[in-house]
Amino acid sequence: MSDVICGGWTKTKKADEQTQKICENVKNQVEEEPQKNYAEFHAVEYRSQVVAGINYLIKVHVGGTNYLHLMVFHKLPCNAGQEVVTGVQEHHHKDDPLVPF
């Protein structure tokens, strides 16, 4: 049985190549506001939500014991299909759960 809930978030899944690619696509957006440059930027796990596009909640390892939680909206192909960062939470740790914000 699928874990897709219409309008709901999936369970947390291990990050894959697609998730890492999304992170690479939005890294510059994430670094803009706090004006930080992350040498490490590796997707660890994620959740997703199908809306008029796809919302992603991604845990990203940025070095040492530091993690970010990213909210990324992936637009539908008819709307250019781009990823846009809609939220960033700093100061997370490896075992922190991914909770929509």
Regions found by a protein language model. Name each.
Residues 1-101:
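N- and C-terminal low-complexity/disordered segments
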